[in-house]
A protein has these predicted regions:
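Charged, low-complexity surface segments at secondary-structure and domain boundaries
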Residues: 1-2, 43-45, 84-88
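Short, surface-exposed ligand-recognition loops at beta-strand->loop->(often short) alpha-helix junctions
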Residues: 3-10
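Amphipathic, interaction-prone secondary-structure segments
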Residues: 11, 15-52
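Intrinsically disordered, low-complexity regulatory regions enriched in serine/threonine/proline
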Residues: 51-167
Length: 167
């Protein structure tokens, strides 16, 4: 007996697992695509209160990617899983953190990283005036992303969910 499941069956299993966690069609959209050399599951989070990490943990159990000894992806029968926020949710997440990011940006001077209140992240401005988001939670930390304030705010929201006062 084979353990192979179709992409449609995997999509149904993901929907059932999400539903068991209380996440239905109003919270998460699950779509399956099949094509000549593989298939994919596309999961879009439709509710800003849903943590994408929780959805990703369920969905990525269905991912199957065959690789050679060098790590290159082999053609055929791969199942890719994509989990992302819906665009409307991205805007809500960014808006919930924007004031904190703007406050931190206003405090940056010289070669410093200013913490964003309530997060393990900080913002900096380089010599050319561009903003960037940094992980300041550990010694290892590092650069996460550059961009305008709303882009950095969305990046925080994608990692942490809604800001506490927005919940």
């Amino acid at each position: 007996m084979s353990n192979y499941t179709t992409c449609t069956e995997d999509a149904a299993a993901v929907r059932a697992a999400l539903k068991a966690k209380g996440l239905g069609r109003k919270h998460v959209s699950v779509r399956s695509d099949q094509y000549s050399m593989g298939s994919s599951l596309r999961i879009r989070v439709l509710d800003p209160a849903v943590r994408i990490a929780d959805v990703r943990a369920i969905a990525e159990t269905k991912e199957r990617i065959s690789r050679d000894q060098f790590g290159e992806i082999l053609s055929g029968s791969n199942r890719f899983v994509f989990v992302e926020y819906d665009y409307t949710v991205e805007k809500v997440l960014a808006a919930s953190w924007l004031s904190r990011v703007e406050t931190a940006i206003a405090q940056v001077s010289g070669n410093s990283i200013v913490p964003v209140e309530g997060t393990p992240y900080g913002v900096a401005v380089n010599a050319y005036g561009a903003h960037s988001l940094w992980d300041i939670s550990s010694e290892v930390g590092g650069h996460i992303q550059g961009g305008e304030a709303h882009t950095l705010a969305y990046s925080i929201g994608a990692r942490l969910g809604l800001a506490p006062e927005a919940v």
